[in-house]
Amino acid sequence: MDNIISGQAQKVEDVDGTRVQNEFSKFLKSFKGDKNELQYKTAMKELVQPEKNTIFVDMQHLYKFSNNLATTIELQYYRVYPFMCEALHLATLDGCDENERQQMFKKQLYVSLYNLDAKTKVRELSADKVGGLVRIAGQIVRTHPVHPELSRACFVCEDCGVSTRDVQQQFRYTQPTKCANPQCMNRTRFSLDVNSSTFVDFQKIRIQETQAELPRGSIPRTVDVIVRGEMVETVQPGDKCDIVGTLIVIPDIAQLSTPGLRAETSNQNRGRATDKSEGITGLKALGVRDLTYKMAFLACHIQQTESLVGGDASGAMEENDYLELWTKMSPEDRSVLKQMSDDKKIEKNIVDSLFPNIYGNHEVKLGVLLMLLGGVAKKSKDEGTSLRGDINVCLVGDPSTAKSQVLKAVEEFSPRAIYTSGKASSAAGLTAAVVKDEESFEFVIEAGALMLADNGVCCIDEFDKMDVKDQVAIHEAMEQQTISITKAGVKATLNARASILAAANPVGGRYDRSRPLKYNVQMSAPIMSRFDLFFVLVDECNEVTDYAIARRILDNHRSISEHTERNTVYKIDDIKKYIAFARCFKPKISDKAAEALVREYKKLRMSDSNNAATSSWRITVRQLESLVRLSEALARLHCGKEVLEQHVEKAAELLNKSIVRVEQPDIALDEDDFDNNIVIVEANKENQGGDDDMEHDGEKDETAKVDPAKLKISFKEYKQLSDVLVLHMRADEESQGEEEYDGVKQSALVEWYLTTIEGEMETEEDFNVQKTVCERVIHRLVHQDHILLEVEPGEDPTLCVHPNYVVSDE
């Protein structure tokens, strides 16, 4: 092997680098931690494993060992990093046997530094930071595939055959400047020996500065981050990360694109005679013209910032077992979580602590809390069918009802939440876009809002302002929780396991109570059915409520100006830990809970068929799945291993409030439809004699005396009256027996009702009003709602209750 010459032989020795190498080697071999044991001995032994190539070093340990060493590394990181890796390599070889030495000889090892005190904003990365150790934070917006990178190359001279080893590659294909053989004059003709060269994993990711660091009104800055070794594929788009590394300057690859030369390079040769042998030969010739450089960040350590209990990031929380997580917790965390789980008013206390600046709307806040907890995602073993566990919530309401405040509060609280506006977002911005990479010119997928919010919450404000084609784009993401893309030759199915919290304004700016929900919002039926909970927020004039809201707003202004914090039961960090721990539970549905689910679903279906005209939206099996998810979330809230009947009842109550709340238009009992029905009945009976006509005229005259304004009742009053009549008829049926029961005459039913409320009537006018209201409610129950059936039609029909009708519990 006489013709093999090391490329390192002609290098001038770096005295400072050698000193750092020796001191860092001593640090790895001798530093002892809190337990008076060698801190990094075990980690170095594990580097023998094929999949391990990185050792993680705490910067605080370096400062404790030697302040000069830590300061030198921090100020001249890029210069001394190869010496640190060499020190790690030699220290690892000292503890290996002969077989392990052969494996470790060609292995590239890395040092990952973390726990650096000072943090630099992405916007503050400038030329003076180049080469030093820097810590930055940002959100991942794009990840590239992992590629092999040529780290240390071995070149063979094509003239004399001498091999030059260990040629360091500086972010581009770098050949030796000349042949290592002193007698050979070759400077350009080299071939790469792939078998003798060292390749490492290489990945480029792009981060964007976080909203917390972004100055008001500024466009977010982005920076490309280069990761190697074990750091590749550790983060996904949407993760908020803490990155330690150094700022580097690299030539713009677009200027160095190969193969071939750019057309503009020939401009420098115009107007002067050139020899055929001349031309652009690479970097040297490229330096003749303007060479643009760009900055990138070479990372040695990257981790998700939102680490909660047990040291795990929130994205992996749901995969953990709660017992395993419990063992990783500190005693302080355990006592706090135990205290919270034993709290009987945990729902109210967490809700009040999460939304201290928003008054009232307890059901809305509870629904958002259950959305943060989520249900249990399931997948069948045979067919592979997936059932989503995430809960989607939509807030519909008048302006100034704190819809956007709820969204903003969730965005600030949730470790992985994306806030976007429906009007300003396109379909590609919500799902994913296919863009061309500036360097490789390959098409790569850039994550949209739903992908960035994977395993989190996507808050979409002004949902009703979205174009129809953009709403269609999220159909698949809301139910199947995937995004399918077929663009520019890229075919992929991406995960979008996010809960959607949407806020929408009603048509015309004000919610019309006389119309059901589906006519108040500009949403298609498929989109509406994909929401588990709808909450309608109506701005009503109420002296007590208005006073309380005004007090809360003024308190907020005073607390902000005086820099005082509102007293809450729980701290935000404690709630984050509790939710992360509760999401590890996967409660099973008990037999009683299953029966309760079926019973509540049947009630929803019956109420939908009974009030088809005024139903807020169609009740389908998706609402049954919503009940299951809400029940599981309630079980998780109490850290339960099983879904109980009380959880189902609470979930049904919440779902009913989100549905019934919008089914409250006022009932006008003097409508033209009612009068038309009376006219039709009278026209059919004109040939039955004048006495009947006289009777009808008398009834009409009596009805005419009633003020039409008093014939308009609220939906709540209509519901109460109909329930009273139905329950009375059911009681009669039970007392007489089903076989002997023939029904109740309408006149007898009206007379019974008037007798019941006799104490509330003072004048004859009150009597006429109540009688007319009762008669017209009965008429509506028969002809429109079909709750009552006419057993014997006629002027005074015999009535009975529809056998399938179920009286609601409200």
Curated annotation (Swiss-Prot):
What residue spans carry the region label Disordered? 685-705
Q: Per the Swiss-Prot or TrEMBL record, what residue ranges does the short sequence motif Arginine finger cover?
A: 529-532
Superkingdom in the source lineage: Eukaryota
Q: What class of enzyme is it?
A: hydrolase
GO CC annotation terms, alphabetical: MCM complex; nucleus
According to its UniProt record, which reaction does this protein catalyse?
Answer: ATP + H2O = ADP + phosphate + H(+)
Q: Name one GO biological process term.
A: DNA replication initiation
Q: What is its main location?
A: nucleus
Record's subcellular location? Nucleus
Positions with a binding annotation for ATP: 400-404, 505
Q: Any additional notes?
A: Early fractionation of eukaryotic MCM proteins yielded a variety of dimeric, trimeric and tetrameric complexes with unclear biological significance. Specifically a MCM467 subcomplex is shown to have in vitro helicase activity which is inhibited by the MCM2 subunit. The MCM2-7 hexamer is the proposed physiological active complex.
Q: How does it assemble?
A: Component of the mcm2-7 complex. The complex forms a toroidal hexameric ring with the proposed subunit order mcm2-mcm6-mcm4-mcm7-mcm3-mcm5 (By simililarity).
What this protein is called in its record is DNA replication licensing factor mcm-6
Question: What organism is listed for this UniProt entry?
Answer: Caenorhabditis briggsae
Q: Which gene encodes it?
A: mcm-6
